[in-house]
Amino acid sequence: EFYAQFRYLVPELYRVMKPGRLLSFHCMLLPTSKARDGYIGLTDFRGELIRTFREVGWIHHSEVVIWKDPVTAMQRTKALGLLHKQIRKDSCMSRQGIPDYLITMRKPGDNPEPVSHTGEGDDIPVSMWQRFASPVWTDIDQGDTLQRQSAREDDDEKHICPLQLGVIRRAMKLWTNPGDVVLSPFAGIGSEG
């Protein structure tokens, strides 16, 4: 169901995007389960999404790994690979935590409205740029999401990978001009709005 919608959406995003502008999406690798998939491991959801965009003509522009605390993930998910007892039993079944990714795609062509950080109220100083340019963002607050207090009951809608507001703020600062319209077709719980 997801891929049917997504494969329809990606060409439409390409159609409405200005040349030279960027589209970012937040995702993670998906853990598999013995009950559902027959094995314990990971699915390269990130790679599948990138390939879907590239098939339409998007350029894989950049990506950032967003560090996540494996202890928090272990406490929340009880994933076998993150449990300390697994190291003692058989460390070949242990694994690292799963980070989030911010993947950025670019539509080919020249950007008709460059995004310039000239210091006129929209400056990005060198120290900030050095943090933003890092391939791993370690300073994103994992609890800073709109979902922080929601989705506590079994029948509540849960997101695979809740988007931290700091990631949105950083992407908007880097890649948009004041007054730009930002399209968020899935909108989730409205974090971008």
Question: Which residues does each predicted region cover?
Answer:
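Core catalytic lobe of class I
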Residues: 1-193
